[in-house]
Regions:
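Phosphate/diphosphate-binding glycine-rich loops and adjacent basic-rich segments that engage nucleotide
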Residues: 15-82
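Secondary-shell segments that build the walls of catalytic and ion/ligand-binding clefts
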Residues: 60-120
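Generic secondary-structure signature for well-ordered alpha-helical cores
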Residues: 3-4, 37, 48, 76, ...
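General structural feature for long, well-ordered alpha-helical segments within catalytic domains
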Residues: 28, 89, 100, 108, ...
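Catalytic-core signal marking the mid-to-C-terminal active-site face
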Residues: 117-194
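Short beta-strand segments
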Residues: 6-9, 33-35, 43-46, 136, ...
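Conserved thiamine diphosphate
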Residues: 1, 5-22
Length: 194
């Protein structure tokens, strides 16, 4: 309760570094959670431009990705999700910025956990022995906790007043709809696509 959460893990190499053609970086997903009443801010993002789940959706639909999302078996940029799933070589988010962020997350996780780097995980027969970091900051232990909560609320309200690009689709913060999703899942079960 009332804690900031920062969690991440490294993975097997599955992305080329910016400027490279073969996988040397991990997808290294990170989750950030900031308390906000019953609806916390939740950011859950991997370092690849498209999650592997989203690539599966595009593959099944037969639609091309909106932008090049990774490399095919000929080491060429592609919008074909099936080709990226075959090579496991997605582009990093933000191109060179995501490449750097992936590297930093890997090295920090390995250092703090005393574990393997992405390179070392990739040398194993299975994706095991990952380095993971779990940081929890109890806001109740801070002297200015009321001001922190007020700042979070004011920032989120300000963000939501941004003029939407698409009329009828208001701007919302990450995690805003999770309470609705959870409630629906509790009532109707978790949807599973066959």
């Amino acid at each position: 309760q009332n804690c900031i959460g920062i969690f991440w893990t490294n993975t097997v190499p599955n992305m080329p570094p910016w400027g490279g053609r073969d996988a040397r970086l991990g997808n290294n997903p990170i989750t950030l959670a900031i308390p906000h009443g019953d609806t916390p801010v939740l950011v859950d993002v991997a370092m690849s431009m498209f999650s592997y789940g989203k690539l599966e959706v595009y593959k099944r639909s037969g639609r091309p990705l909106p932008v090049d999302g990774g490399l095919n078996k000929n080491q060429q940029p592609t919008r074909n999700a099936a080709e990226i799933l075959e090579t496991h070589e997605s582009y990093p988010i933000g191109y060179w910025k995501g490449s750097g962020l992936s590297l930093a997350l890997d090295l920090i996780a390995s250092a703090l956990a005393g574990g393997r780097t992405t390179r070392q995980v990739g040398e194993l027969p299975l994706e095991t022995e990952l380095s993971q970091v779990f940081i929890c900051i109890n806001l109740d232990s801070l002297p200015d906790k009321e001001n922190i909560a007020a700042n979070v609320e004011a920032t989120l309200r300000d963000m939501e007043t941004s003029t939407p690009v698409e009329e009828g689709r208001p701007v919302h913060f990450p995690g805003a709809h999770m309470a609705e999703v959870r409630s629906d899942n509790m009532e109707n079960g978790i949807p599973v696509e066959d």
